[in-house]
Regions:
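Coiled-coil-like amphipathic alpha-helices with heptad-repeat character
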Residues: 1-2, 142
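Residue-level marker of structural boundaries
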Residues: 18-19, 128
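C-terminal segment of N-terminal export signals and the immediately downstream linker at the start
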Residues: 3-8, 20-59
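Sec-dependent signal peptide hydrophobic core
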Residues: 13-17
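Mature-region segments of soluble proteins
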Residues: 41, 52-59, 63, 72-191
Length: 191
């Protein structure tokens, strides 16, 4: 597959996610594979986000789902941002908004510099649409995206599969119909 074709494929995946459709596991597998290739020589180097933005995303990921950073959720998101400008705008703008709000509210340089209770208080404000206001709407929109993408990135990774006990499609050496439902169906049959 040529690099241009791969890029078009990844951009199509990102565009589908922006339209609100769920990410099929096969497409997520392609993204995780591409991230693994990028990580092959050591630690993942962000492709779309700045070092600060990526560190903030890692921190947010860990708050949303502990263990998601090690499972590659931030790299999954960054990779999609690298092929989709709209998604990149959501994350760079959202992280910038979050840092700015933390500065106004707590006089810190950014989200990662705040104390855990300050971070939790801020996320509690933007976690629920019932708190919608002109001031909080950008954060609510961003955090909604961040949560969904962290969940997608984590639960389509090997660690996420392991957590839920997903083994993939398994071949059966022998198949038999369970007798209890079969007997129940036969008893109800009028013939």
């Amino acid at each position: 597959m040529s690099e241009q074709t791969r890029r078009e494929m990844f951009c199509g995946i990102a565009a589908a996610m922006l339209s609100g459709t769920l990410l099929p596991a096969q497409q997520a597998e392609h993204i995780h594979h591409a991230v693994a290739e990028a990580r092959a020589n050591g630690k993942y180097a962000p492709k779309a986000l700045t070092t600060h933005e990526y560190a903030t995303l890692e921190h947010l990921s860990e708050i949303i789902i502990p263990g998601s950073a090690a499972a590659g959720a931030p790299a999954f998101i960054d990779f999609l941002c690298s092929v989709c400008d709209d998604m990149k705008d959501i994350f760079t703008g959202g992280i910038g908004w979050l840092d700015e709000q933390m500065g106004h509210r707590y006089q810190v340089a950014g989200f990662v510099d705040a104390r855990p209770e300050q971070q939790t208080a801020m996320l509690d404000l933007i976690a629920y649409r019932k708190n919608a206001s002109p001031e909080l709407n950008p954060g609510i929109h961003f955090f909604d995206w961040a949560r969904r993408m962290v969940v997608d990135g984590y639960y389509t990774s090997a660690a996420g599969f392991k957590e839920v006990g997903y083994m993939g499609n398994q071949g059966l050496s022998h198949f038999s119909v369970p007798q209890e439902p079969l007997q129940y169906a036969l008893k109800r049959c009028p013939v």
